[in-house]
Design a protein with these regions (language model features):
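Positively charged n-region of N-terminal signal peptides that target proteins for export
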Residues: 1-6
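Noncatalytic, solvent-exposed loop/strand surfaces
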Residues: 21-444
C-alpha cells in the first residue's frame, strides 16, 4: 500500500503534467524530474533573484567530484546528482544536503573495464549525463548501457540494479528516465538498437519493451546499416501527458517521433522525419505536441496534433519549419508563445499556434541547458556560465545578465562549459550545476 505522502506526491505530479504549457502552476516544493514537476520548466510563483555572482546571492557553493552533466533533482532537503570517472570506469550517485551544500553520500553503483568510447561526442557529453528521478523514499539513477539503479533515499542502500539493458550509444547516453505510475520508463536510442522499455519501479523487472519502428532506409539487404553512427541516434527524454482521460507518451527518436501508451508500450502513432540526434524534450500545448527532430538538412521543429493511428504526417501536422530552432536546449511555453535559445547566441519567440516567429534577440553564448520560467520571468543558462533573464512577451526585453566563474586549471579534464545541466528550483532557491560545482542561488 502506498504511503499517504507518496500518494499526494504522485497525484500532484500527474496533475501538473496534465497542465503542461499552462502558466497556472503551483509553487514547487520539489524538483523530481530534470524539467521539474510539470516536466516543462515551469516553476510557479518562486521569488528568485534577478542578479547573482560568485559573491552575491550565493547561499553555498560545493565542488562536485569526478564528471557528470546530469541536472540536480531535489526532494526532502536532498539534492541528487550522478557522476562518473572521466574515462567511464566508475559510476556514482551523489546526495547533497540542500540546506548546507554538504556532500552526504557518494554511492558507487557500476564499474566498466572497457567503457564505450564517446568519440568526439566527449566534448558535449559525459558518462553521467541522464538525470535522476525521485519520489518519496526512492531515487532512480540511470547511466544508459552501463546500468540503472534504485536507491532508498533514507538509508542510501541499493534496492535494485540492472546492467543488462544494452545499446551502442556511440556519443554517450543522454535520455533521462521517466516515472509513470508503477513504472520507470527508459529510452535507448543507440547506433545499433533503438527501443523504449518500462520497468517495474519496485523491482526493476521488465514490464514491457517496444522497439522503434521507423523506416531507416539505410540498410544493406542483410539489415546492417550502410553507415553506422549518428543516423539512428537520439538523446531526447519522453513527455507523458493526460489527454481526454488517457495517458500519452511522446518520444522523439531518429527518423520518427512516436506516441505510446505508457502503461503498455503500445505504439499509437508516428510522425516520420529526416533527422537524427534529437535532443530537446517535447512540449504539449492545446492538443498538440511541439517536437524538435534533431540534426541533418531535414531537421525541423513542428507542431503535431495528438491522436491518430499509424503514420500521421498527412493528417496531424499543424505547422513545421526548418530554420531557427533549438538543437540542444528544450523550448519553454508561456501564454501561447514558445521561447528557446539556439546555439548561435540568439533567443527566439514563436507563436505556438501558428509557428510564426514573433521576435529574435541576441543573448550571447551557446546553450545546452533548458530554460525555466519563474515568477513571470524566463531564465536562460549558457555554456559560458552566464544566465540571461528576460520578460515574456511579444517584444524581446532583457532584465538582467549574471555570471558565475567557470575557470579551471588547464590540466583539469573537467574544465570548460558552465551550464550543460538544467537548473532545479525549490521554494525560492535555485540549484545550478556547472561542470565542477553545485550552487544554491537565493536572495539574501
Amino acid at each position: 500500500m502506498k504511503s499517504p505522502r507518496l500518494m499526494l506526491f504522485l497525484c500532484a505530479l500527474a496533475g501538473t503534467a496534465a497542465l503542461a504549457g499552462s502558466t497556472v502552476v503551483p509553487a514547487s516544493d520539489s524538483w523530481p524530474d530534470f524539467r521539474g514537476p510539470t516536466q516543462d520548466g515551469h516553476v510557479g510563483d518562486a521569488n528568485l533573484p534577478d542578479s547573482w555572482s560568485e559573491t552575491e546571492n550565493v547561499k553555498w557553493k560545493t565542488e562536485t567530484p569526478l564528471l557528470g552533466l546530469s541536472s540536480p533533482i531535489v526532494l526532502d532537503n536532498q539534492v541528487w546528482l550522478t557522476t562518473a570517472t572521466v574515462e567511464g570506469h566508475e559510476f556514482y550517485a551523489l546526495c547533497f544536503d540542500a540546506t548546507t551544500g554538504e556532500l552526504t553520500t557518494q554511492v558507487k553503483l557500476f564499474h566498466s573495464d572497457d567503457p564505450q568510447s564517446m568519440g568526439n561526442g566527449a566534448k558535449d557529453n559525459s558518462y553521467a549525463t541522464p538525470s535522476a528521478v525521485i519520489e518519496p523514499g526512492r531515487v532512480y539513477v540511470h547511466y544508459g548501457h552501463f546500468g540503472t539503479a534504485c536507491l532508498d533515499t533514507e538509508t542510501k542502500e541499493v534496492i535494485w540494479k540492472r546492467d543488462d539493458l544494452k545499446c551502442w550509444h556511440y556519443r554517450g547516453a543522454s535520455s533521462s528516465p521517466v516515472l509513470f505510475e508503477d513504472l520507470l520508463i527508459l529510452t535507448f536510442d543507440g547506433a545499433d538498437l533503438q527501443y523504449v522499455i518500462g520497468l517495474d519501479k519496485k523491482t526493476g523487472e521488465t514490464v514491457w519493451k517496444t522497439d522503434r519502428s521507423a523506416e531507416w532506409n539505410d540498410e544493406h539487404i542483410d539489415k546492417v546499416p550502410i553507415q553506422e553512427g549518428d543516423w539512428r541516434k537520439a538523446h531526447s527524454t519522453p513527455l507523458i501527458v493526460e489527454i481526454d482521460g488517457k495517458s500519452v507518451m511522446c518520444s522523439t527518436g531518429a527518423k520518427a517521433a512516436y506516441g505510446y501508451d505508457p502503461r503498455t508500450g503500445e505504439e499509437l502513432w508516428q510522425v516520420e522525419h529526416e533527422a537524427y540526434s534529437a535532443t530537446p524534450r517535447p512540449l504539449y500545448h492545446d492538443g498538440s505536441f511541439i517536437i524538435v527532430t534533431g540534426f541533418s538538412k531535414g531537421a525541423e521543429m513542428m507542431s503535431v496534433k495528438a491522436g491518430g493511428r499509424g503514420v500521421v504526417n498527412d493528417t496531424h501536422i499543424n505547422w513545421r519549419f526548418d530554420t531557427s530552432f533549438p538543437k540542444y536546449s528544450s523550448p519553454i511555453l508561456v501564454d501561447g508563445l514558445l521561447y528557446y535559445a539556439m546555439d548561435d547566441s540568439f533567443a527566439v519567440c514563436v507563436d505556438a499556434k501558428t509557428g510564426e516567429t514573433v521576435w529574435k534577440g541576441r543573448l550571447g553564448g551557446k546553450y545546452r541547458a533548458c530554460p525555466i520560467v519563474a515568477g513571470g520571468k524566463i531564465y536562460f543558462f549558457s555554456l559560458e556560465g552566464n544566465t540571461t533573464v528576460i520578460e515574456p512577451g511579444r517584444e524581446f526585453k532583457v532584465l538582467a545578465t549574471n555570471a558565475l566563474a567557470t575557470d579551471a586549471p588547464l590540466d583539469d579534464p573537467r574544465r570548460g562549459p558552465g551550464f550543460m545541466a538544467s537548473p532545479a528550483v525549490v521554494g525560492d532557491a535555485m540549484f545550478l550545476r556547472t561542470r565542477y560545482h553545485l550552487y544554491r542561488i537565493e536572495a539574501k
